Structures are given as structure tokens and as C-alpha cells.
């Protein structure tokens, strides 16, 4: 039965235009591209778009440091990003920029509608201001002495020595990172989006059943803690769009960034002339809209974005497809270890299809982190693609080319086996469609094993030596070629370059519907190597090329001690005053109004403590901490913060930011036990 083609618009999160694409970015773009290519193979009308996120203070300041205009910097970065994505065969229909006229017009339209509908509120807030640069300073653009441990050179939101969190106004001797000047406190009127007004709508959307369970659960936590109004404005100087009717005020980057999805699509519509923008974005649109995003930006896409769309009379997303992070060899990507790998560096040493396949073999519809184990990567690609799939073609093509002038047999040697492959297409299609990529790969490789068993059992190399069995030889090898064709059709969304070479060899396009009709009495091309085995030397070269060049510096001391020297010696009596206890993390949640803090509820053996900890960058999904044991300083004097009372401090190691690691006791430790 012929299905009606769907109209689908697919986006990936917009890469920020101040840095290169790395393998963490590539997980999302590969995942989305596989899904898009599959949908296209099934006859659906799919538009796949992206853009660079090109606004904000970091871009403005980096351009100043480089001595170029922000417009030039983001244009250069856009070209680099597009080259990287093209190298990985990401099949975008359009790649644009948030710094565009389309995005400006749509941002102003959405803001104006929100304001007219009463969803924009004004109020005055106090911020640190750089008198030399004439600009308000974000938290990370202020440094000073920690008010808690008195360590110098700490950021304006948390101390990387003692992990204390605070507001920039609490810093001792604060200085502007931009100019070195002493900032002053200054009031400014800001504009806020009234997110709480959309709480009922958002909760209904959450309960619709479309969202991933993990996303819906996290959203419910946010609803339970209460939604807050969202500051959508920034003061000049700022690289972005000025707010209509508010000179010197600019849209915060996170307002116009998701509107960039619309801007990129509008740009495509205008260039093509045959796509109706409103058919995809109007309130009653029957098109499907999907955003592939990382778990670190769920808050913006599940709350702010649908609320903004609802309040401005546009349609909401059909769904969010959220993925986890990428680790390499079991750890966070590291420049010093050579595992912080840029997309361009990968392509200088290895092919794109290999990474696409490995990611597909590990991806599911859940929000799980993916580990790129480089040794396993080599073994898996060689075992699956070289030894199973490509070898199936090579071991049969030689006989067909040499003995039968490239012509396949008129009949299938084993129709029942071929029917098994046809029947499997339904399950594999469902796996691709539901983003259960690892299941699809497992099923495909199981059938690749079955195909190779067939060839092993039929032993064409033996049949070739037997008189009068030419017809059997042709039928056996033709069967092998046909099974290879089906396998490659299933893998076409994952490995487009290999699929293209397979199509040239088969003299036939690989189409999903074509699986049901085997190639009979058909001429294939002379066989050429379709895919080369990956050698570990290539991977070692990739790692070496990715390492930071630290040899020139030749520091006397390297490692953590160089960055954080030992403190002055203290007496045992002083140490004995510190009461450290094992604590069970009963609950962990984001803190509204802070992009650095987590609120932890700790059980220390019958007593509950509320602790604010500046570890959000390292643990962006706090739900993963629930149930863990950690170590806390239990007799630290409670500290009143603007978010509440913090009743202790959890212990963590690392330089700070994303590179901080919560301490955990060995198995057997119990909440409340003293650390001695």
C-alpha cells in the first residue's frame, strides 16, 4: 500500500560561530543526517537545515582580540563549518547564519507579537559595569578574589579552588576581564519574557506522549520548581540585533538563536521559490518539525522555544530528539591526550563513513552518552564493514566478472533466504525511523553473517573447479551479490560514500523499494576495492595531530600541581576541625537564574542538607547524580545565597568548568560515615 509522503522539516542545533567543529558536534549532525537520508529513501519530502549561531558577547570580544570585524570572523567560521559538514556528507538543504536579514525580521516579528500580547515585561536589575569599555559584564567576564577561600583570579560566579559559588558583586577586588578596570554596579532596564504564563500549555505539551521519557521527566521537575521570567535583553555594546523601539538594547543570543531555524528555512524558501514557508510554520501546519539537540540545551528548546512560538502564533515542534555527549576512550575529550579531535583533523586521517557507522552502531533513541573507543572503532569497522559486507561482494564478484562477463543469473539460487532479507526490512525500517540505530545495525550485521554463511556453505571456489556446474556457480555468486545489494541498501543512510561506490559496482541505484526485486540477468561492473581496512597507525596519527603543542613551553612543573600549587602546611588540630561525611545525593536539580549552580539534597545518615554547588558545567544533566554517594564538608557554617541557604560543601577535584569531578567513596561506605 502506497503511503502518503510526509512533509518534514529537520534541524540540528546551531554551532556557535567562535570555534571549530569537533567530534562532539558531529554526533548530532550524523544522527540527524542518517535519519533524514532514511526518510528521503522512503519518499518523504524532507528539508534539512542548519545555521551558525553568530551573536553574543564572546563573539564580539574574540573578534576584537583578532583585530577583525565580527561579521568577517563569523563569515570565515561559517565557511569552515560548512566545509567540515560537507566532508562528513551531512546533506543540508541550507546552511545559513543567525546574523541575517531573514533572522532579524523574524526575531523582530516574534518579539513584537509577544509584546503586543502582553508577554514582555520590563524591570530594572543591577549589574557590574566596565567603565573603561562602557559595557555590562557577564559573570565570566569578571575576575577577583574568592570571598570564601580568598584565592585570587577567580571568575565572577564560582571559585575553581574551593568550588564556592557567589554573585559577581561578592568578589573581593573585582576586575574586568576585558579591560582590567574595576567594575562598578549600575542599574539597567531589561526586558523579560513571561514564561510562567505558558506553564499550562507546556505541561500539556509535555504530557502529549511525543517527547522522550527522560525529557518529559526533566521538564516535570522544572514545572514543580516553578518557571521564572526569562531575561531576553542585553545592553550595548553587544553583537546582535537591536530591539525595536529600545535604542541600546539587544536581543539576548538565546532569543534569536532558535529563530535561526526559521531564518534558515526562510532563506531556503526565498532561494528556491517553490517552498511555502507558512505551510511549515503557521499555527495549523500539518508538516512535521523535528529538532535534533544535545541534552545540555533541553531547557531552552523544551520551555522557552515552544512558549515563544505559541505566544507569537506560530506552530510548536512536533518533537525534540535529544542525544547525550561524546567521550573518547572512556573520558572527556582532552587536548593534551589528543582526544579533542576536530572534524577537519579526522578527515585528514580517516574517512567520514567510518565514524558515521561507529556512531550509528552506538546510538539509540535514549539520551545516553556515546563513547568513541578508538581501538573498538578500528576492530568494529574492520570486522563489520570490511570482513562482512564488502567481503561479500568481493568474494562473489570475481567469478561473475571472469566466468560470466559480469552477468548475474536469471534466477535466485535460494529464494527462501532472499525472502528472509525482504521480511527483515520491516524491522530495520522501524529501527531507522524510531532512531534505534544500534538495533538496526545489529540486525543488519546478523543478516550479513547469514549471507556469508550461505557463501561458505555453497563454496563457490569449489564449485568453480567442478565440470558442468557453471550454472550453479553463477547462481550462487549472483545470490551473494544480491544479498550484498540488500545490505548496502539498508546501510545507505549511514555510509553514503560506500553506497555510492556500491551503486557504481552494481550498475543500479540503491532504493528501499528495490529490495523486493532482485537483480536478475543484470550486468555488474568490474569489481574495484570498495572500502579499505583501517590500520591503527592511522588512528595514532590522528591522536598525534590532535595534541596540543606543549613542547615549546617546557614548563618546570606540569600537571595539576603546576596549576594549583599546594597550600601552606596546617596542623593536625586544624585539619581535625573539618568534619567530612559520606552523603547520599537524594535529589539534584538546576538552579533557575544561575548557569553554574546545582541544588543538591543530601542525606548524611538521617539528616538532610541543602547544598548549592558550582558543578553544573560538568554535570549538565543533574538527574544522573541522583543515587550517588559523595563526600561533603558537614560542619561548614551555612551560607545564605540569593537562591537559598547552602548547608555545606561537596568535595570535587579538577580545574573547574566542565573539567571538575565529584568525589565518590569506595563501595561499602554508608551515608553519615565520617571521612578520616
UniProtKB/Swiss-Prot annotation:
Binding site for ATP: 335
Cellular component GO terms, alphabetical: cytosol
Main subcellular location: cytoplasm
Catalytic activity: tRNA(Met) + L-methionine + ATP = L-methionyl-tRNA(Met) + AMP + diphosphate
Cofactor note: Binds 1 zinc ion per subunit.
Cofactor(s) of this protein: Zn(2+)
Alphabetized GO MF terms: ATP binding; metal ion binding; methionine-tRNA ligase activity; tRNA binding
Keywords: Aminoacyl-tRNA synthetase, ATP-binding, Cytoplasm, Ligase, Metal-binding, Nucleotide-binding, Protein biosynthesis, RNA-binding, tRNA-binding, Zinc
UniProt cross-references to InterPro entries, sorted A to Z: aa-tRNA-synth_I_CS (IPR001412), Anticodon_Met (IPR041872), Met-tRNA-synth_bsu_C (IPR004495), Met-tRNA_ligase_1 (IPR023458), Met-tRNA_synth (IPR014758), Methionyl/Leucyl_tRNA_Synth (IPR015413), MetRS_core (IPR033911), MetRS_Zn (IPR029038)
Pfam family, one: Anticodon_3
Locus of motif 'HIGH' region: 15-25
A GO biological process held by the record: methionyl-tRNA aminoacylation
Record: residues binding Zn(2+): 146, 149, 159, 162
Subcellular location: Cytoplasm
NCBIfam families, A to Z: metG, metG_C_term, PRK00133.1
Function: Is required not only for elongation of protein synthesis but also for the initiation of all mRNA translation through initiator tRNA(fMet) aminoacylation.
PANTHER family: METHIONINE--TRNA LIGASE (PTHR45765), METHIONINE--TRNA LIGASE, CYTOPLASMIC (PTHR45765:SF1)
Protein's name in the database: Methionine--tRNA ligase
Amino acid at each position: 500500500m502506497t503511503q502518503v509522503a510526509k512533509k518534514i522539516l529537520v534541524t540540528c542545533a546551531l554551532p556557535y560561530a567562535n570555534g571549530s567543529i569537533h567530534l562532539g558536534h558531529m554526533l548530532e549532525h550524523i544522527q540527524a543526517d542518517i535519519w533524514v537520508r532514511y526518510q528521503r529513501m522512503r519518499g518523504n519530502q524532507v528539508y534539512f537545515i542548519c545555521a551558525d549561531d553568530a551573536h553574543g558577547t564572546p563573539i564580539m570580544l574574540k573578534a576584537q582580540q583578532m583585530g577583525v570585524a565580527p561579521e568577517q570572523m563569523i563569515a570565515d567560521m561559517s565557511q569552515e563549518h560548512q566545509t567540515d559538514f560537507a566532508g562528513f556528507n551531512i546533506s543540508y538543504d541550507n546552511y545559513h547564519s543567525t546574523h541575517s536579514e531573514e533572522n532579524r525580521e523574524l526575531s523582530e516579528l516574534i518579539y513584537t507579537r509577544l509584546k503586543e500580547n502582553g508577554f514582555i515585561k520590563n524591570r530594572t536589575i543591577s549589574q557590574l559595569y566596565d567603565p573603561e569599555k562602557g559595557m555590562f559584564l557577564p559573570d565570566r567576564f569578571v575576575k577577583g578574589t574568592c570571598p570564601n577561600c580568598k584565592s585570587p583570579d577567580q571568575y565572577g560566579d564560582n571559585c575553581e579552588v574551593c568550588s564556592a559559588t557567589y554573585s559577581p558583586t561578592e568578589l573581593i577586588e573585582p576586575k574586568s576581564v576585558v579591560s582590567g578596570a574595576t567594575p562598578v554596579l549600575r542599574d539597567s532596564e531589561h526586558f523579560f519574557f513571561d514564561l510562567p504564563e505558558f506553564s499550562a500549555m507546556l505541561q500539556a505539551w509535555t504530557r502529549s506522549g511525543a517527547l522522550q521519557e527522560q525529557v518529559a521527566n526533566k521538564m516535570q521537575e522544572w514545572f514543580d520548581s516553578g518557571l521564572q521570567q526569562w531575561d531576553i535583553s542585553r545592553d550595548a555594546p553587544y553583537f546582535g540585533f537591536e530591539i525595536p523601539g529600545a535604542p541600546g538594547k539587544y536581543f539576548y543570543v538565546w532569543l534569536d538563536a532558535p529563530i535561526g531555524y526559521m531564518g534558515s528555512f526562510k532563506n531556503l524558501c526565498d532561494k528556491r521559490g517553490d517552498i511555502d514557508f507558512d505551510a511549515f510554520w503557521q499555527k495549523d501546519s500539518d508538516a512535521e518539525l523535528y529538532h535534533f539537540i544535545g541534552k545540555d540545551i533541553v531547557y531552552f528548546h523544551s520551555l522557552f522555544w515552544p512558549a515563544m512560538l505559541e505566544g507569537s502564533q506560530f506552530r510548536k515542534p512536533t518533537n525534540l530528539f535529544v542525544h547525550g555527549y561524546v567521550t573518547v576512550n572512556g573520558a572527556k575529550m582532552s587536548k593534551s591526550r589528543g582526544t579533542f579531535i576536530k572534524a577537519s583533523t579526522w578527515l585528514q586521517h580517516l574517512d567520514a563513513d567510518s565514524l558515521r557507522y561507529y556512531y550509528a552502531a552506538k546510538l539509540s533513541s535514549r539520551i545516553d552518552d556515546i563513547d568513541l573507543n578508538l581501538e573498538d572503532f578500528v576492530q568494529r569497522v574492520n570486522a563489520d564493514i570490511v570482513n562482512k559486507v564488502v567481503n561479500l561482494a568481493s568474494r562473489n564478484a570475481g567469478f561473475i566478472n571472469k566466468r560470466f562477463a559480469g552477468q548475474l543469473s536469471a534466477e535466485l539460487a535460494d529464494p527462501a533466504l532472499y525472502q528472509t532479507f525482504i521480511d527483515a526490512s520491516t524491522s530495520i525500517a522501524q529501527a531507522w525511523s524510531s532512531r534505534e540505530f544500534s538495533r538496526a545495525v545489529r540486525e543488519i550485521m546478523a543478516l550479513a553473517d547469514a549471507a556469508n554463511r550461505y557463501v561458505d556453505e555453497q563454496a563457490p571456489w569449489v564449485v568453480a573447479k567442478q565440470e558442468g556446474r557453471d550454472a550453479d556457480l553463477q547462481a550462487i555468486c549472483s545470490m551473494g551479490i544480491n544479498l550484498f545489494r540488500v545490505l548496502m541498501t539498508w546501510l545507505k543512510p549511514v555510509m553514503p560514500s560506500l553506497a555510492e561506490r556500491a551503486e557504481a559496482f552494481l550498475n543500479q541505484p540503491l532504493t528501499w523499494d528495490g529490495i523486493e526485486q532482485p537483480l536478475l540477468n543484470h550486468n555488474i561492473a568490474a569489481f574495484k576495492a570498495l572500502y579499505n581496512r583501517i590500520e591503527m597507525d592511522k588512528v595514532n596519527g590522528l591522536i598525534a595531530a590532535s595534541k596540543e603543542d606543549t613542547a615549546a613551553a617546557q614548563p618546570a612543573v606540569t600537571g595539576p600541581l603546576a596549576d594549583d600549587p599546594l597550600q601552606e602546611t596546617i596542623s593536625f588540630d586544624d585539619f581535625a576541625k573539618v568534619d567530612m561525611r559520606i552523603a547520599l545525593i537524594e535529589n539534584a536539580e538546576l538552579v533557575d537564574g544561575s548557569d553554574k549552580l546545582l541544588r543538591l539534597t543530601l542525606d548524611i545518615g538521617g539528616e538532610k542538607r541543602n547544598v548549592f554547588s558550582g558543578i553544573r558545567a560538568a554535570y549538565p544533566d543533574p538527574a544522573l547524580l541522583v543515587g550517588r554517594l559523595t563526600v561533603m564538608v558537614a560542619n561548614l557554617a551555612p551560607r545564605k545565597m540569593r537562591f537559598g541557604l547552602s548547608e555545606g560543601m561537596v568535595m570535587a577535584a579538577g580545574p573547574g568548568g566542565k573539567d571538575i569531578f565529584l568525589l565518590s567513596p569506595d563501595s561499602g561506605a554508608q551515608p553519615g560515615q565520617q571521612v578520616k
